[in-house]
Amino acid sequence: MLFYAIALEVMLSDGFSLREILRDPAQQTGQSSFLGFLSNIGVWLWVCSGAICLFSAGVGGFVSAQKQKQLLILIGMLSLVLAVDDFFLLHDRYLPQRAVFLCYAVFTIILLVRYFKNLMEIEGFAFLSAGGLLALSIYVDLNQRKFPFDYAHVQTVEEGFKFVGAASWLYFCYRLASFRFRRSADSKGRNGES
C-alpha cells in the first residue's frame, strides 16, 4: 500500500493524470492488448528468473554452500535489474547505453571469475548460451546502423537474441535453484535425516 501511495504521489506531482498512471497503455490508446506482447513476456522472463533465484537463496539450508547462496543472490539481483531496465527502457531512453552495457559486461566477467567452477558444475552450457545470446543482442543493438538491412529486420534479430537469451537465462536460473535443492537433499540423505 505504501508503494502504491508513493507511486501515485510522485507521478501525479510529475504531471501524469490518474488515468495515465492507473490504466494499461493499450486501454489508454485503444490499441490491441497484444501491443508489445513479446517485450512484455521478455520482462516476465527476467522477473521469473530473479524470483526463482532469490526465493531459493532465502529458504535456507546453506550451511556448507555459502558461495552458492551468494551466487543465487547475485544472479537474482542481476535478473531484476535487467527486468527493470527492459521494462522502463532505461538504457534506451534515460541512461547512457554504452555505460549500461559496460556495467553488464563487467558484472558478468566478475561472476565468471568468482564463480566459474560453480557455474560450470551447475549448468555451464545454459549460462554460456544465455550470455552469448544476450551479448549478440547487445552487439546488434550497438551496431544496427552498420548492417545492410532495414531497421525492422535488424530489430527483429536483436530482439530475438534478447528474448531467447532471457528464456535461456530463466532455464539457467531454474537449474541453479534446483541444483541447490538437490545438493541440500543429497546432504540430508547422507546424514540420515528425513
Task: Give residue spans per PLM region.
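Polytopic alpha-helical membrane-helix bundles and their juxtamembrane interface segments
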Residues: M1-E193
